[in-house]
Amino acid sequence: MDAIQKLNDAIAKVAGGNDLYDTYKETWQYLLESYIGGEEYRRANHLVRYQLETEPEYQARLRTTPLENHCASVISVYNSFLFRTEPKRDLGSIENLAETYDFMRDADFDGRSLDNFMKDVATWTSVFGHAWVVVSKPNINATTRGDEVEAGVRPYLSVLTPLVVLDWNWSRSPSGRYQLNYFKYLEDVNKDVHTVKEWTNDVITTTVIDMGEETITDTIIEPNGLGKIPAVCVYNKKGVVKSIGISDIADIADAQRFIYNATSEIDQSIRLDSHPSLVKTPETNAGIGAGSIIHMPENLDPGLKPYILEFSGASVDKILGAIQHQVSNIDKMANTGAVRATESRVMSGIAMETEFQLLNAKLSEKADQLELAEEQIWKLFCEYMGYAWNGDIDYPGSFNIRDTGSEIAQLKTAAETSPNDPQIQKGIAIKVAEWMELEYDEDEVMPTTTPEDRPVHMQEMIMGGYEDAQILALHPEVTQNDINNARTALLTNQGE
């Protein structure tokens, strides 16, 4: 009995998490279900169960209730802006290493490039608030770097969600910097067989546990040649507790669950309106379907004749209004109202600009955290390769989020207000050309046209492929009417 108890204690120690893990585990699981959606969300039973509702009825309601996955939508919007422009990397002394080239193309030995890997890291940090990246290098007891190159050995990355990082501990170095001195995570799960890896500054311990048989089947201990734990905690936004970040969807997930339950209520309301309940005595024989016949006993009391049970719950319109209110709240929390809008919304120019600025600030903060994390990753990469990191990583710090349709409408109004002012027309033309991403030299000098030679010159520029915006920018004295007249004359001449 003592031996069995000792074994159970050993398994619990190896496979168990620390207090922070136990505290946040359910929250992390809920956030993961909210992001993934689909069958995972359905199995989590996030629908509120009715009183006296049987299990088959509840399961049927789960199967017929769709999920509007706002969590995934918001994170997708963030990532689309974050990685629209690739980060700039100056890798310094390791720029031309073959290992660096391979690492950039296949960062995790699973075919993902470093950019794609960092995009996954950004996704999981948005979901959980933080994620861990482990930089590993296989130990093959190579004596020279040539042996490692021949064997294809180089550092690679692994991203770990908080749900698999079971235990960790920080300590302060003499310089005051925090450093990990213990790190334990669940490396692999194959049915009942769990593989747990523990890192210290000196050794790496890999333990294989058969949870079904409750036995430890294998333990591998190897030296940690790096002398430190190569794990990087990547934050979405730092929280008050070290190693615990703030999720982007913590509050959005609750609103999404409300919408999920409200959608179920709409389904039930429609079903009750279309197929109301019939109250009758056991002796009354009622058919099923439209126009069915009801047979009542001849001696039935008139007060017991069948009748329809009227449904008096909340109307569908009221529930839809509540859902729309929650969608609006989600957009406010995520600062994505103007970006995720699927229909025209009444927003003033100042309100829209303010929302764009708030979204830009949020994205800039996320980009700064990714930039900091990638620099730490490259430092560990260099330590494995025997180099000192002297490079620089630069993620975009500002994101061009604009309502171009509104801007073009404003420019059109301005052009119609002052059609004969060449300076205003030129400024408008330049703005339109920027929006259209036209390439031309604004400082290019063009001879000023006269009313006599202007039509011919306009026709030459049109034939040369110049856009209207380019012509207006290069010739302040020209108006849009001049260009239209030249184009009309050109078409007439070609027709003749």
What would you call each of these model-derived segments?
Residues M1-Y41, W199-V241:
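N-terminal start-of-domain structural block
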Residues K318, H325-E496:
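C-terminal helix-loop subdomains that flank or include functional centers
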Residues T215-T354, P396:
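Extended, charged amphipathic alpha-helical segments
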Residues A10-G17, T27-G38, E53-T54, V77-R84, ...:
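Surface-exposed polar/charged interaction patches
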Residues M1-L157, E496:
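Extended, helix-rich architectural segments
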Residues F109-S113, F117, T125, D251, ...:
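Short amphipathic alpha-helical segments
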Residues A122-G239:
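Extended, regular secondary-structure scaffolds
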Residues S76, S80, A122-W132, A250-Q268, ...:
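Short, hydrophobic/amphipathic alpha-helical patches that form generic packing surfaces
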